[in-house]
Design a protein with these regions (language model features):
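Short, intrinsically disordered, charge-biased short linear motifs at domain edges
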Residues: 1, 164-167, 172-181
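Acidic-residue sensor for enzyme active/binding pockets
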Residues: 2, 36, 194
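ATP-dependent adenylation/nucleotidyltransferase module used to activate substrates
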Residues: 6-169
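Local cysteine-cluster metal-coordination motifs and their immediate loop/turn environment
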Residues: 98, 174-197
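Glycine-rich nucleotide phosphate-binding loop and flanking beta-alpha elements
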Residues: 120, 199-200
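Short amphipathic alpha-helical interaction/hinge segments
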Residues: 143, 200-203
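Short cysteine/histidine-rich metal-coordination sites, predominantly Zn2+-binding motifs
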Residues: 181-182, 202-212
Length: 212
């Protein structure tokens, strides 16, 4: 019994679906929400998993991040570059996981999955192992049913995740990465760069349509 909260790496947990009861997307006003959420819904429907979208529009109003300020505000370059720190939405995972944990307990579900990965650690504090450990402990301590937060990809790369997805037969053309949220992947932002690298590392033909 699991609850799941789609990008390239997010697709993987729902294809290991023997326990998953619910998929959650959060619409928090990011540039790419409108591109990413339909893919999440599509994959859940294909696998017979209930999917819901929760509106967190207030984050766009009160939180500071280039991810919430339009495509032109998104920096280009690699995830490791300092300028990519502008894409951090403060405590985003903490907020979303807290909501998911509450929904899990309300439905007597025992686990909440998150698909953060090793490449996130450089700039996203709420993707790091110490954060995952802390919120897992908080979830267990703060719920009657001892909800646990499960983050199986915390210490592996996006390329390794892509390799697992390849074995599961996932079509990565049916996922979204680009932070700019245009009609096509821009090919230059941090997530696009890492997407290209991950697919190449896994030996997967990249059929993504890039602007450049």
């Amino acid at each position: 019994t699991e609850i799941y909260t789609l990008s390239l790496h997010d697709a993987l947990p729902i294809y290991k679906k023997d326990e998953i009861a619910l998929g959650i997307s959060f619409n928090y006003g990011s540039n790419h929400n409108e591109r990413e959420i339909p893919f999440a819904k599509m994959h859940c429907e294909r696998l017979g998993i209930k999917h819901i979208t929760i509106d967190l529009g207030f984050m766009h109003q009160y939180f500071k991040s280039s991810l919430l300020e339009g495509a032109d505000a998104i920096p280009e370059g690699h995830y490791a570059d300092d300028n990519m720190k502008s894409t951090v939405v403060p405590f985003r995972n903490g907020i979303m996981l807290s909501i998911a944990i509450g929904i899990a307990e309300s439905n007597n579900l025992k686990k909440v999955f998150i698909a953060n990965h090793g490449g996130d650690h450089t700039i996203y504090p709420d993707c790091r192992p110490e954060f995952i450990k802390a919120i897992d402990e908080a979830a267990e301590a703060g719920t009657f049913v001892d909800v646990r937060v499960v983050a199986p990809y915390t210490n592996i790369t996006k390329g390794q995740i892509a390799e697992i997805g390849k074995k599961l037969g996932i079509d990565y053309a049916e996922t979204w990465s680009c932070y700019k949220g245009g009609e096509k992947h821009c090919g230059k932002c941090g997530t696009c760069v890492e997407r290209k690298e991950a697919l190449a590392e896994a030996g997967i033909e990249d059929t993504t349509e890039y602007e450049e």
